[in-house]
């Protein structure tokens, strides 16, 4: 694996509080490298050590809360992950040469948000293919849980016993996402923001990725015409895996309809106690069902086959019992093996889930019919051999190939017809396509 890939994994773990238990040494051990080597990689690619990167993120987040909210300083200290006010004050004073109170006095605060509502600008390194990201998410948006319209993505969230929602729009001129969050507990804001960054793949280093893709004749034209295509992540790994199982051997549209039925039947209505009727007006009404609920749910009632229903229940039981976890995963291969032990989940789904739920940049569902079609190949082994040149960024190559394949399928050929009938987001003994 490439060194940029190691940094990418480390950033994901840091976003999941990967430095809280043992610091850089434990983080490096989880990544399978030495702590000194990890520090060198961070200095080479980011110009700062892992601890400095994590601290800078928290400081910038705290500064944002000081400037643009009326939260008390002790709540800001907790929300930005400092743990105590003393460390928070010391960190702010050292970097900004002013106390938090002095900074707030100087802040304009001309657009303060109502209580429990926050607006953040989440910057990325261009190019960023926002249109491709939103198109991908729009096709797979679960009715009631997610909604995409007019360049804006919205979804409901549940965290630490509270309901909320957020919406995302893309400001290409300032190279940032605009995240509007409504959530009642400010202590969760840092986690929410970090999860959004991962979901929209904002930490990706396009300059490193493109080096592995730009010299392949099959990709060069698309990479140059559509630079910055990212790999969409997810809010919740269990939700994504369930959605992938729902989509086995049916179209994306059909799978989306099933996900809507699943949510309406087994999901919980979004709480309106925090002034969330606005969310309902924006197409958000429910939270996706939890593993505990689906573990014993009668899923055939929404039109699933008995085998498909049992696969979802088995996954739900494994997650509810803690046997399968989607956070803090370092060994993607071991994770995929765990998934494949569940009857009805095969290598395609495992790769797809690793790609989107773990942010694994080298995940590659080589049996996917859409990928094979885009490359003009018949055998997954041939595709895997060809894809060696794209390591460690094969997930990004997959996004481009799906885009190529989806456009090529528009001609009404027999193959295109077959793709329309086959599943687009699952895993079965056959090869299963997915397209943008």
Regions found by a protein language model. Give the residues of each.
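HhH-family (HhH-GPD) DNA N-glycosylase catalytic core used in base-excision repair
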Residues: 1-436
């Amino acid at each position: 694996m490439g060194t940029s890939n190691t940094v990418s994994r480390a950033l994901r773990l840091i976003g999941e509080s990967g430095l809280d238990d043992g610091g850089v040494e434990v983080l490096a051990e989880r990544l399978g490298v030495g702590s000194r080597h990890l520090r060198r990689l961070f200095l080479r690619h980011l110009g700062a050590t892992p601890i400095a990167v994590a601290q800078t993120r928290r400081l910038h987040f705290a500064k944002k809360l000081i400037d643009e909210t009326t939260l008390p300083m002790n709540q800001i200290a907790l929300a930005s992950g400092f743990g105590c006010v003393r460390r928070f004050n010391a960190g702010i004073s050292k970097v900004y040469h002013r106390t938090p109170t002095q900074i707030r006095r100087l802040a304009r605060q001309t657009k303060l948000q109502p209580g429990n509502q926050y607006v953040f600008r989440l910057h990325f390194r261009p190019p960023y293919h926002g249109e491709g990201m939103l198109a991908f998410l729009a096709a797979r948006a679960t009715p009631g849980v997610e909604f995409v319209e007019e360049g804006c993505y919205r979804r409901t969230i549940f965290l630490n016993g509270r309901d909320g929602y957020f919406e995302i729009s893309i400001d290409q001129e300032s190279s940032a996402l605009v995240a509007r969050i409504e959530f009642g507990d400010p202590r969760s804001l840092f986690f929410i923001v970090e999860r959004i960054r991962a979901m929209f793949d904002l930490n990706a280093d396009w300059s490193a990725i493109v080096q592995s893709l730009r010299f392949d004749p099959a990709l060069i034209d698309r990479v140059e015409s559509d630079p910055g295509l990212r790999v969409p992540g997810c809010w919740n790994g269990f939700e994504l895996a369930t959605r992938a199982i729902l989509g086995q051997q049916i179209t994306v549209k059909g799978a989306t309809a099933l996900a809507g039925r699943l949510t309406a039947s087994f999901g919980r209505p979004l709480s309106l106690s925090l002034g969330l009727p606005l969310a309902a007006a924006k197409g958000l009404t429910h939270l996706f069902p939890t593993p505990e609920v689906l573990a014993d749910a009668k899923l055939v009632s929404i039109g699933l086959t008995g085998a498909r229903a049992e696969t979802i229940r088995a996954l739900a039981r494994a997650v509810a019992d803690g046997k399968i976890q989607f956070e803090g995963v370092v060994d993607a291969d071991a994770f995929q093996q765990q998934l494949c032990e569940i009857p009805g989940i095969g290598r395609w789904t495992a790769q797809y889930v690793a790609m989107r739920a773990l942010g694994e940049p080298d995940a590659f569902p080589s049996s996917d019919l859409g990928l094979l079609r885009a490359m003009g190949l018949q055998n997954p082994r041939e595709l895997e051999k060809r894809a060696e040149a794209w390591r460690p960024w094969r997930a990004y190559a997959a996004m481009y190939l799906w885009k190529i394949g989806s456009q090529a399928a528009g001609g009404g050929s027999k193959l295109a017809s077959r793709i329309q009938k086959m599943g687009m987001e699952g895993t079965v003994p056959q090869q299963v396509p997915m397209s943008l």
